[in-house]
Amino acid sequence: MRQRSVRISALALAVTAAMGASAFAPPAHAVRSPHAAQSTPGHEATRSALRDLVEKGGQPGVAAKTSDSRGSWYGAAGYADTATGRERSPGDHFRGASITKTFIATVLLQLEAEGRLSLDDTVETWLPGLVRGNGYDGSRITLRRLLNHTSGIANYTADPEFVHNAAGPGFPEHRYDTHTPEELVAIALKYPPQPDPEKAPSYSNTNFVIAGMVVEKATGHSYAQEVTRRIVRPLKLRGTSFPGTSPQMPDPHPVAYSRFHQDAPDAEIHDATEQNMTWLGAAGDIISTTGDLNRFQRALIRGELLPPAQMEEMLDEVPSGDGTGYGLGVEFAQLSCGVKVVGKSGRTNGSLSAMVGTQDGKHQLTFNVNGDWLQDGSLYVNAIEAEFCGKTPLSTRQPSRALPDSLPDSFATRPGSGD
């Protein structure tokens, strides 16, 4: 039987590896009660998949919202705060991590439609000297190749020292550090380019850090200002923001629980809610809500944000294997029932998210888990399968390392993974 490509290498989570802070161990009841907090009737398969993320996956809580021809549905399980028993709520703000990339790509495509740049422009044209040396030549890398991960530029979040500080034992000391885009690109360029990137896409956060720099160079404004002006305000995404150096989260929000990517079942759990997201910047600093992301996804796919020519460019798929592929700031996955979905996933410290929809723009799902140690990747994918297929496949267990190994976002490798 064909395994549903859900080693969803593309559409499954931004693996930005977890950060943690002050020691905080949730009480045992945190994952014992998979009740559906404030869930509304319907979507039984999805409801069951959410409960499984808490009950079988050991996650603190999960919240999801869907939108289709029948209207909107909200479902949740577990807790926003395991210490107080506060449940997840429809208005919860969370860190969407690499879902940011879809917003950045949309802005660049809008700029192309306005004649202010071309995606066939090179990095060297816009940012002279930035990508040069150690086998790199920015005059041969186009903006398009940044957005579909065929640039070959190394992923700075695979650097061992960076991982140590951003995701491991160094996090408590470094959680409030501010990073510049130039610093992040310089880390990446210490490593040689990926071979034949146009034949085999290689996911790299560095691509979108550079893309954010191009937005700033082309407009004279930060990527956050441009996304806010062009997308957030017109769509009235009132729960969406780009925090910059601020480590705070707007209320309401769940506690973001992290295990520092320690695999031991009894690994200590930490509160990673506060963090300075300049370590991802244009590659992943968005804060949003399930409702906002559904609205954005629907407007985008229905062509409300881009002209037809740019929409076609965004959805031009570069296959990455097993029924998955990359567009420009979006990813594709073929589900077990034959439905092909498009969207983006995101994972950062204490937060796992997905923004997924059908390619006709008629059906959307966004969900967020406020924990980051899910070892059984099939439980995550089952939430997508349940919503768009109405059921989950018979196979429900991926290898214990399936999640980090199969997902290319943010941290392509983990400390000690050897990948």
Indicate residue ranges for each PLM-predicted region.
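Short active-site loop at a secondary-structure junction
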Residues: 57-60, 84-145, 195-204, 281
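Catalytic loop of the DD-peptidase/beta-lactamase superfamily, centered on the K-T-G motif
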Residues: 2-5, 26-75, 268-419
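Short, surface-exposed loop or secondary-structure junction motifs
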Residues: 135-341
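N-terminal export and membrane-targeting signals
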Residues: 1-15
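Residue-level preference for non-acidic, small/hydrophobic
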Residues: 50, 70, 101-104, 108, ...
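Primarily hydrophobic membrane-targeting regions of prokaryotic envelope proteins
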Residues: 65-67, 97-98, 102-118, 206-217, ...
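C-terminal segment of classical bacterial N-terminal signal peptides
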Residues: 19-27
